[in-house]
Amino acid sequence: MSYPIERVRADFPLLASEVNGQPLAYLDSAASAQKPHSVIDREAEFYRHEYAAVHRGIHTLSAQATSAMEAVREKVASFINAASAEEIVFVRGTTEAINLVANSYGRTFIQPGDNLIITEMEHHANIVPWQMLAEAHGVEVRVLPLAEDGSLDVAQLPVLLDERTRLLAVTQISNVLGTLNPVKAMIAQAKAAGAVVLIDGAQSIMHQPVDVQDLDCDFFVFSGHKIYGPSGIGVLYGKRDLLQAMPPWEGGGAMIRQVSLRTGITYADSPWRFEAGSPNTGGIMGLGAALDYVTALGREDIQRYESSLMQYALEALTQVPDLTLYGPAERHGVIAFNLGQHHAYDVGSFLDRYGIAIRTGHHCAMPLMEHYGVPSMCRASLAVYTTREEIDRLVAGLQRIHRLLGS
């Protein structure tokens, strides 16, 4: 059975838009994916007919909203094969999830003189929180470098690991290069050295199945808006014994069991101890609908379709003169490039005139830009709704820019 691309595209209302008098070719899903009708409708339905404050409400609407929220927690656990829904913490997104781990686990279990390892290809969200921890607590940040082909130089990992390595934080798929890192093997190496491992799944979650138990990672983080869900909602997966040992990062309502001005605070169990205040319940409902959508479409089918589309795109882009591609031969979801000596901003601006949306800049990965000696790159990204015709339009647009501007 062939991939139902026309039906899929019909599910996403914004794809019918025009930009600058041209049909929209949305090639910026790595930044944020479009939303299907089912996600938009589920969030709207919740606010129209089901909304109430969750937790401890005595009335029916509150109890139902709480049950619906916890049902999505169960759904997330199933989606990534967590051992328990109590290993799922709702956060605003990947960035907050990493900051939570850095501030709760990091400030408790990583001591002055210890070290942690990140990689040269990380998004700033998986660099800056660890640098802040290092500055505040005298922790060393070690960096696993890139190899020449755009993959990680994983042979250097055993060199970086030692008895004082407390954590490895690594992206599963690079948001710039599309590199699929061998995280399962890296996790095993790090854990053998006594370190815990955080996997940034912001890019991988939309392109392939994720099984946190098979990976044996300690933490896994992702954002809802990358997987066709709402903005402002994300997930921190953490092994239950680790979450239970970690102190809360933020204080307030919902994360306590008892508060006394005389005897102090008793915190709730995880995951609720990490969910202070009123949650984004509408976003949580939309996230659940997004996971339903991806599951119904079939994650293996998505992976096969996008892999075929990537090969088509890479072959088609060879027709563009003076195009430099960055990253490994085999990549997932994103294609980073520059056209001649032209600034990425200029290339992206011309493509926008043609109705083609890409991302330009440093992609929150300045160390990666420094590695390649460029200030910025263009990035086109694929999703469940991307077509070969859109790739053809990208190629034609780049050829047109080259004719207009030269090298």
UniProtKB/Swiss-Prot annotation:
Residues the record marks as active site: 364 (cysteine persulfide intermediate)
Pfam family, one: Aminotran_5
Keyword line: Cytoplasm, Lyase, Pyridoxal phosphate, Transferase
Compartments it resides in: Cytoplasm
Pathway membership, UniProt: Cofactor biosynthesis; iron-sulfur cluster biosynthesis
Keyword Metal-binding among record annotations: no
Main location class: cytoplasm
Coiled-coil regions listed in the entry: none
BP terms from Gene Ontology: cysteine metabolic process
Domain of life: Bacteria
Similarity field: Belongs to the class-V pyridoxal-phosphate-dependent aminotransferase family. Csd subfamily.
NCBIfam families cross-referenced by the UniProt entry: PRK09295.1, sufS
Quaternary structure annotation from Swiss-Prot or TrEMBL: Homodimer. Interacts with SufE and the SufBCD complex composed of SufB, SufC and SufD. The interaction with SufE is required to mediate the direct transfer of the sulfur atom from the S-sulfanylcysteine.
Protein name per Swiss-Prot or TrEMBL: Cysteine desulfurase
Organism listed in the record: Pectobacterium atrosepticum (strain SCRI 1043 / ATCC BAA-672)
